[in-house]
Amino acid sequence: MPSKPADGTPAAKSPATPAPPAQPRLRVLAGPNGSGKSTIQTELKPEWIGVFINADEIERKLKDFEGTLSLPELGISSKPSAVLRRLEKHIKDSPFAAKLGLHRLLGNMTIDKVGVLKVPGPFDSYLATVLADAIRRKLLEEGKAFTFETVMSSRD
């Protein structure tokens, strides 16, 4: 029973302590092609998913939007210049990107002030895979909750 001051009025309640923020989560939907990874993603609650990173979706967006990709829509909130440096470092350091000849992108990508990445073509699944990996790594750096889909078919 709450205590009452001497005048009989109810004591003021102390402000509620806010719940601690949820811990960021990383979820991986993995399996061979056609195993239902994308289907499972559509059945999960959005609050469970966080940001969803899918190389197939990245490839489609690059093709549909002439090489542009909104990084804020993918959960990235760092300064554009820092994100661009991180993307270029990832491409430079990735043996997979080197094998694919993606070093041609170095110095040729831009990110505008609202976080839209512009990448020169051609736009294919290999480019999308490297970008998806770089985006996942950036989300990890930023401490964001996210889910990604992968076939886990390569050590790279």
Regions found by a protein language model. Give the residues of each.
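N-terminal pre-Walker A segment at the start of P-loop NTPase domains
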Residues: 2-15
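Phosphate-binding P-loop
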Residues: 15-24, 139-140
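Short hydrophobic/aromatic beta-strand immediately N-terminal to the Walker A/P-loop
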Residues: 26-28
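The conserved Walker
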Residues: 32-33
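Conserved glycine(s) of the Walker
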Residues: 36
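Hydrophobic positions on the alpha1 helix immediately C-terminal to the Walker A/P-loop
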Residues: 40
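Conserved substrate/cofactor phosphate-moiety recognition/catalytic segment
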Residues: 44-141
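ATP-dependent NMP and nucleoside kinases share a basic, alpha-helical "lid"
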Residues: 140-142, 151-156
